[in-house]
Amino acid sequence: LMVCYGGDGTLLEGVHRLCGAPIPVMGINAGHLGFLTSAPSAGLNLIFEEVAAGRLTTEPRSMIEATGDYAEQPDTELGLNEFTVQRHGAGMISVETYVDEQMVATYHGDGVIVSTPTGSTAYSLSAGGPVVAPTCACLVISPLAPHNLTMRPVVIPDSATITLRIDARRSDAFVTLDSRVYAIGQEAAFTIKRAEQKIFLAVPHNISFYDTLRNKMMWGIDIRS
């Protein structure tokens, strides 16, 4: 068991260090929101009693594998939440997007997010993407500030392979995997697909995904009451 004490960024760094090894990860929230670090820092003794008694729930979470034109990195990297392409300068970038070699759209704007179900409550949510239960077998493609009123997020099966072709000749661009930032050239291409490896999140047995949605994001809460 790996225990990450901090916020979601701490847990994502721990996941990166595991490199897909089948070791459960438990996040104890000492940060601000802590959606993935669902165990509260108050009452640590009770939490570790549950660990010792084997009362944790282990949830498998899918990861993504992104292969492409990193400037100074290996060709392939893994992520738990999302892969993003983002503009670095003032101008728009264009991202041709394909699913299983079929053209989906060319997104003109600030970039594109490819999210896992786990990452659907992170950056993708801020870009208007849907909340996806972590057990769903899908990926979400969300445009970032698209210069087109008809562009909306799209949900695809996680058996598909996504190809992104980036044209950033008018503005510098970079890509991210979770909290890690990578430089790229003006014209780069990446393929994103579900990774063979999974991450196993260990959570207290009395905390569900929907509990976390309500408690951390006020989901479904009537603010008038």
Regions found by a protein language model. Give the residues of each.
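N-terminal glycine-rich "phosphate-gripper" loop used for MgATP/nucleotide binding
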Residues: 4-8, 15-17
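Short glycine-rich anion-binding loops that position phosphate/pyrophosphate groups of nucleotides
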Residues: 7-10, 31-33, 118-120
